UniProtKB/Swiss-Prot annotation:
Ligand binding (tRNA): 14, 64, 66
Its job: Hydrolyzes ribosome-free peptidyl-tRNAs (with 1 or more amino acids incorporated), which drop off the ribosome during protein synthesis, or as a result of ribosome stalling. Catalyzes the release of premature peptidyl moieties from peptidyl-tRNA molecules trapped in stalled 50S ribosomal subunits, and thus maintains levels of free tRNAs and 50S ribosomes.
Subunit structure and binding partners: Monomer.
Protein name: Peptidyl-tRNA hydrolase
Superkingdom as given in the UniProt entry: Bacteria
Membrane-spanning parts: none
The encoding gene: pth
Pfam family, one: Pept_tRNA_hydro
Xref: PANTHER family: PEPTIDYL-TRNA HYDROLASE
Keywords: Cytoplasm, Hydrolase, RNA-binding, tRNA-binding
A biological process term (GO) from this entry: protein quality control for misfolded or incompletely synthesized proteins
Enzyme Commission (EC) number: 3.1.1.29
Subcellular location: Cytoplasm
Root EC class: hydrolase
């Protein structure tokens, strides 16, 4: 079993914001593989199912971004999974919009949701998929991540969400190294 944890903020006001790119990828996986994310468990909305024969728990923490680690830790502890069976999906300011990047480990890179997970799990050796949202040309980063994607950005984002879902599918079925080779291009 794998846990796929998409990071974001709960509530309708954050639904289409840049900071919720992780939720969007998990929703894309759910749609593509017929998994309903309706249960409340582990301080999260969850859905259990299979992706090409691999059992998964899709997890959307409802703790707000900066406390995501508490929800992810509960799920990992409950299933007694090694961290290699967790994939965290989140937005990345340092990647251009339209790019994705898979990593097996690393620092939080300033992302507070990932920082919370690293702190709660006590390790940086956590597989992750980062969704590029780019940096604002001007203005505050905090305001930028909490703003919705523009119409033009959504045109770039939609195929990126599908690409991210495909990358996770390859990681689960053919291995993370194969997925990194196939999907970590450009950016």
């Amino acid at each position: 079993m794998f846990i796929i944890a998409g990071l974001g903020n709960p509530g309708q006001e954050y639904e289409n914001t840049r900071h919720n790119a992780g939720f969007m990828v998990v929703d894309e996986l759910a749609k593509k593989h017929g998994i309903l994310i309706t249960k409340r468990k582990f301080k999260s909305l969850v859905g259990e199912g299979e992706i090409l024969g691999v059992k998964v728990l899709l997890l959307k923490p409802q703790t707000y971004m900066n406390l995501s680690g508490t929800a992810v830790q509960e799920a990992v502890s409950f299933y007694k999974l090694p961290l290699s069976r967790l994939v965290v999906v989140y937005d990345d300011l340092d990647l251009p919009l339209g790019k994705i990047r898979l990593r097996l480990k690393g620092s939080a890179g300033g992302h507070r949701g990932m920082g919370s997970i690293i702190s709660c799990l006590g390790s940086e050796e956590i597989p992750r998929l980062k969704i590029g949202i780019g940096r604002p040309a001007v203005g505050d980063v905090k305001d930028y991540v909490l703003q919705p994607f523009t119409g033009a950005e959504r045109e770039i984002l939609e195929p990126t969400l599908k690409l991210a879902a495909e990358a996770i599918t390859v990681a689960l079925t053919e291995g993370f190294n194969k997925a990194m080779t196939d999907f970590n291009r450009g950016g």
